[in-house]
């Protein structure tokens, strides 16, 4: 796992936990929010393990039921298929959980937290300008009507490009990865499209500064 990718994820989680008017938050307040985000991830790992265990148990129960309750081959096949689906879901969930210990360990590193704080500070300091820039790039959408998670992913990306000087393509790729993990099924395509339409506005603003 890349430390900066984890820092972005922490910043995203932290943004969702900020109050409605975060302008007066101190650096110490932001640090506390980042710590809370790390704890949230640890809690997610525990929840995912418990859910996977329940799915495996349900899958096992369906297999047993297929042997005892099925009245014909078709109903037995349906029960077995459901059991396999539950098992596959549990395995996929466990695969995600296996990454979390490394994630949490890296998230506790100072350089990761520092970069998260840099992102948060830039987003909060320039939030009005960032939101206005994104609004101009949207087609048939209002920025404040987007899902909160998508708004925050876009804000992080613009803040990185404009104020932290992260290469544009790297930033877009990282924003897409965040959207794949946290947005809905088509969220990553939407985020990618908005950011690509935002590039001319970003370049114009960069030349004007």
UniProtKB/Swiss-Prot annotation:
Keyword Coiled coil part of the UniProt annotation: no
Signal peptide as annotated in the record: none
Gene Ontology MF annotations: RNA binding
Gene Ontology BP annotations: DNA-templated transcription termination; transcription antitermination
Entry keyword Chloroplast: no
GO CC aspect terms: cytosol
InterPro entries named among the record's database cross-references: NusB-like_sf, NusB_fam, NusB_RsmB_TIM44
Pfam families: NusB
Cross-referenced Gene3D superfamilies: NusB-like
Family (UniProt): Belongs to the NusB family.
Protein name stated in the entry: Transcription antitermination protein NusB
């Amino acid at each position: 796992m890349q430390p900066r990718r984890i820092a972005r994820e922490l910043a995203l989680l932290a943004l969702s936990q900020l109050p409605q008017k975060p302008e007066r938050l101190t650096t110490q307040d932001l640090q506390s929010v980042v710590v809370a985000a790390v704890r949230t991830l640890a809690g997610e790992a525990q929840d995912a393990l418990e859910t996977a265990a329940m799915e495996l148990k349900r899958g096992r129960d369906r297999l047993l039921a297929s042997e005892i309750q099925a009245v014909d081959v078709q109903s037995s096949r349906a029960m077995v298929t459901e059991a396999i689906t539950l098992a596959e879901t549990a395995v996929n969930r466990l695969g995600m959980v296996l990454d979390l210990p490394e994630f949490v360990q890296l998230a506790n590193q100072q350089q990761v937290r520092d970069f998260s704080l840099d992102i948060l500070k830039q987003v909060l300091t320039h939030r009005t300008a960032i939101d206005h820039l994104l609004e101009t790039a949207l087609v048939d959408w209002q920025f404040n009507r987007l899902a909160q998670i998508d708004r925050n992913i876009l804000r992080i990306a613009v803040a990185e490009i404009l104020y932290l000087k992260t290469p544009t393509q790297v930033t877009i790729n990282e924003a897409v990865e965040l959207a794949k993990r946290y947005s809905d099924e088509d969220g990553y395509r939407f985020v990618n499209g908005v950011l690509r339409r935002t590039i001319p506005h970003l370049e114009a603003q960069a030349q004007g500064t």
